[in-house]
């Protein structure tokens, strides 16, 4: 079932985590709901503690106060600042909202369809006392992707004849009409706090590690996955520790099955994060993540290495073996506020002495409307060496991937990238900037473009470098702050070695997740 774990396999783990946290944690007050992933709609990001660990809990998010203007009428608050349905009763808070993304371009596909997105769904959130919160979302999606994305969506599924394509950020998909894609999406979580400063989550969602637009370790680009997490605060909130135990899937099916549609080949994914807020301006964090073997072609599904169940930083060293059966990556992240509005950040990802990725960035927040809204500009440089995440041919089921998506950067490895991202706000009007400039390995051995994560080590051959440019800029109007409902007009332009694709688009959407079409 989506979002659920088999109780038999994990009940002992849950009990251990519960008592472990009760014994070791010092307590501070914590809220329980996650802030939505949206790089362009996180106000005062520079003021958030432990900013490398995402999703943010409401404790650290500077939320928009929908009641700060007492002279605003009820209907205006409902239209512009509140959820469609809002229930407040003692310690209970419930909200319901429609979610959608209606995007259309005047340009047509080769079959005569307009490039478009047709996404419809809903969101329900709830706080039931201070100890229990939940959120659930459901979407139906039809896409007519730009040509470069459509080709990649089909290529990623070509090795499994029961799957037509992938939908980016969603997972497996079916063909829709001649050249469209249809996919469903359901996610959600339940948060429980047995004591102050301790939060457990059981859900179907995603995570992110880092301060930049990109992450070289773990990104929300990947589709939702089943997970169980624990989050603990020490020393008056200066230290934050989080561990996550997840179940991922390869985009290939188990060969022998008694059902018409066999189960996808599984793998287990565990990651530990430790963040230290040394001062209000200085933060350091560590990351340890491993894709554990959970399937053997000869014997079928198997139990992952015991260290998968340990919620302790450093325990994944125990999983390293001579056969590279488990794929481990380590990382460090740091950030420093030069001023209240300007932040420097770095990230390093390490697999071995000759496989080290690096990120350097700067983010500046400012206002052009007397602090009514916050604008920002983000400049970052990302470098990932060739075959950074690749595994050998004997361990293809332990790739750093989930449902045909890279776990970290959408371009995989073998590139250097400059990314310029930002948003200029004036009241509810905005100008959004999203441009990347990349030098990336040109594939050899007839391999697809930017596919190194899914290619075994011995087949990766970088014969030359290609120049990739993605330009995605828009202007628009923010309608509702609770759902980030907006209308925008913009363009998506992509150049690969001087060959351009250009798309004009009109969009009416609720912006609660990142798209990552710049690949």
Set out the residue ranges of the language-model regions.
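Exposed, low-structure sequence patches enriched in small/polar residues
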Residues: 183, 277-278, 282-519
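Short regulatory "switch" loops immediately downstream of catalytic or recognition motifs
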Residues: 1-4, 248-250, 438-441
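Outer-membrane beta-barrel channel domains
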Residues: 32-283, 290, 294, 360-383, ...
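Long, hydrophobic/aromatic-enriched structural stretches that serve as scaffold segments
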Residues: 4, 197-200, 328
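Bacterial Sec-dependent N-terminal signal peptides
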Residues: 1-34
């Amino acid at each position: 079932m989506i979002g659920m774990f088999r109780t038999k396999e994990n009940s002992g783990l849950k009990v251990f985590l519960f008592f472990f946290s009760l014994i070791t944690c010092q307590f501070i007050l914590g809220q329980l709901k996650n802030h939505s992933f949206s790089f362009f709609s996180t106000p005062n990001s520079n003021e958030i503690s432990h900013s490398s660990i995402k999703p943010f809990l409401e404790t650290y998010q500077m939320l928009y106060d929908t009641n700060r203007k007492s002279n605003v009428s009820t209907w205006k608050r409902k239209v512009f600042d509140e959820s469609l349905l809002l229930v407040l009763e003692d310690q209970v808070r419930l909200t319901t909202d429609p979610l959608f993304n209606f995007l259309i371009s005047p340009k047509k596909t080769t079959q005569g369809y307009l490039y478009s997105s047709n996404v419809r769904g809903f969101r329900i959130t709830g706080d039931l006392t201070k100890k229990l919160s939940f959120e659930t979302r459901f979407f139906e999606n039809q896409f007519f992707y730009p040509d470069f994305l459509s080709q990649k969506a089909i290529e990623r599924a070509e090795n499994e004849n029961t799957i037509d394509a992938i939908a980016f950020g969603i997972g497996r998909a079916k063909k829709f009409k001649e050249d469209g894609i249809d996919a469903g999406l359901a996610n959600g979580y339940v948060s429980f706090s047995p004591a102050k400063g301790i939060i457990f989550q059981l859900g179907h969602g995603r995570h992110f590690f880092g301060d930049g637009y990109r992450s070289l370790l773990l990104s929300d680009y990947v589709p939702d996955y089943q997970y169980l997490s624990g989050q603990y605060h020490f020393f008056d909130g200066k230290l934050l520790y989080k561990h996550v135990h997840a179940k991922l899937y390869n985009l290939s099916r188990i060969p022998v099955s008694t059902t018409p549609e066999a189960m996808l080949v599984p793998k287990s994914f565990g990651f530990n994060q430790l963040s230290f807020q040394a001062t209000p301006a200085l933060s350091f964090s560590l990351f340890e993540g491993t894709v554990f073997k959970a399937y053997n072609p000869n014997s079928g599904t198997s139990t992952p290495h015991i260290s998968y169940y340990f919620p302790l930083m450093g325990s994944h060293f125990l999983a390293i073996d001579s056969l590279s059966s488990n794929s481990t990556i380590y990382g460090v992240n740091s950030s420093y506020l030069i001023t209240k509005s300007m932040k420097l950040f770095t990230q390093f990802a390490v697999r071995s002495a000759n496989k080290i990725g690096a990120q350097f960035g700067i983010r500046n927040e400012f206002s052009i409307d007397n602090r009514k809204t916050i604008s920002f500009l983000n400049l970052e440089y990302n470098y990932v060496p060739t075959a950074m995440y690749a595994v050998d041919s004997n361990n293809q089921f332990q790739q750093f991937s989930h449902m045909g998506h890279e776990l970290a950067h959408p371009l995989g490895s073998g590139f250097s990238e400059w990314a310029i991202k930002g948003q200029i706000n004036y009241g509810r009007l905005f100008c959004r900037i999203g441009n990347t400039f990349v030098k990336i390995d040109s594939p050899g051995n007839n391999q697809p473009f930017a596919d190194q994560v899914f290619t075994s080590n011995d087949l990766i051959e970088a014969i030359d470098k290609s120049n990739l440019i993605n330009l995605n800029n828009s202007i628009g109007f923010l309608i509702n702050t609770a759902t980030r409902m907006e209308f925008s007009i913009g363009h998506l332009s992509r150049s690969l070695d001087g060959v351009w694709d250009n798309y004009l688009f009109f969009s009416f959407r609720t912006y609660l997740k990142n798209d990552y079409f710049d690949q």
